[in-house]
């Protein structure tokens, strides 16, 4: 049987999360393939995944390529007409339910129009009563480079059960047509971590495609298990990559200048003061490092 769908996820020192995800997927379905890209994890995790899940295709990277680089490795070996990128810290709620049916709803959305190139499921958090994390995005502000995830933090009463276009995909779970990737290009690797899915969304849109939110499929997200909510790594890349995103995507010089001014002179200063007050000089240092590296290292 031909491979219709390639599910791609990245493992980086997250064996338990990756195994939880594998256990929630219909691995016995021969019309799909599951690809795990191991980004140079410690403790030989790639081999452990291969031994536990022989039906899964495991790619060993000899270095950490980041989110985009790891997924691009997966793209290069994927056989499916559709590629489903999901974080390893996500799970489908209950394998006894029709997980493949939910996944197929994303494929059906992509097949409903030649213009749709990318689709995301409803994303809910795994904690408490599983509040909504994502039901689409609002547009990014040209100046602040911020937007809102629709429904984030709300209890799910079915109020976001209608499919609709969204300007950006959520990196935790996004399915893409292969032809859209061939036209738009693979994920931008200059970001390494954070903002690459927003940049890629714009690349997909510039190639002539639209992006949709499809709530007939729901995935549950543990959120930032790989980097931590308040880690210097996360702070550094968020600081640097907001500026990099502006450089790559700002529509004009005026907007770019105003964004730089806002992000460096207001956001970075405020964040640094906040971190120092809360006795987190490591995070304040990460902010400064992110700005310094953005200014002193050109990236396309």
Residue ranges with predicted function:
Residues 97-185, 190:
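Acidic/His-rich active-site region of diverse nucleotide-sugar glycosyltransferases
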Residues 31-40, 59-61:
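Short beta-strand/loop segment that forms part of the nucleotide-sugar
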Residues 180-192, 198-220:
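Catalytic donor-sugar/metal-binding loop of nucleotide-sugar-dependent glycosyltransferases
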Residues 233-241, 252-300:
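Non-catalytic, C-terminal membrane-associated alpha-helical segments of glycosyltransferases
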Residues 23-32:
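Short, acidic, metal-binding catalytic loop of nucleotide-sugar glycosyltransferases
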């Amino acid at each position: 049987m031909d491979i219709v769908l390639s599910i791609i996820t990245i493992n980086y020192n997250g064996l338990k999360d990756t195994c939880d995800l594998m256990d929630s997927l219909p691995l016995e379905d021969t019309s799909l393939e599951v690809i795990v890209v191991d980004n140079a994890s410690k403790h030989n995790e790639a081999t452990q995944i291969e031994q536990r899940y022989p039906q899964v295709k495991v790619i060993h990277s000899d270095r950490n390529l980041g989110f985009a680089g790891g997924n691009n490795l997966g793209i290069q070996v994927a056989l499916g007409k559709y590629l489903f990128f999901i974080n390893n810290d996500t799970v489908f709620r209950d394998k006894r339910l029709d997980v493949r049916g939910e996944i197929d709803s994303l494929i059906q959305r992509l097949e409903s129009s030649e213009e749709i190139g990318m689709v995301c499921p409803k994303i809910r958090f795994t904690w408490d009563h599983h509040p909504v994390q994502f039901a689409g995005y609002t547009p990014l502000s040209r100046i602040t480079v911020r937007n809102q995830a629709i429904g984030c933090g709300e209890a799910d009463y079915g109020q976001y059960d209608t499919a609709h276009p969204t300007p950006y995909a959520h990196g935790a779970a996004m399915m893409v047509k292969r032809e859209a990737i061939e036209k738009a290009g693979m994920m931008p690797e200059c970001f390494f971590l954070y903002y690459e899915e927003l940049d890629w969304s714009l690349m997909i849109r510039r190639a002539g495609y639209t992006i949709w939110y499809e709530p007939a499929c729901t995935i549950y997200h543990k959120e930032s298990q790989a980097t931590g909510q308040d880690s210097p790594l996360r702070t550094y890349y968020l600081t640097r990559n907001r500026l990099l995103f502006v450089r790559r995507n700002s529509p004009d010089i005026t907007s770019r200048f105003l964004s730089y001014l806002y992000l460096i002179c207001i956001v970075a200063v405020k964040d640094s003061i906040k971190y120092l007050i809360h006795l987190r000089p490591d995070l304040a240092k990460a902010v400064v490092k992110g700005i310094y590296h953005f200014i002193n290292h050109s990236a396309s």
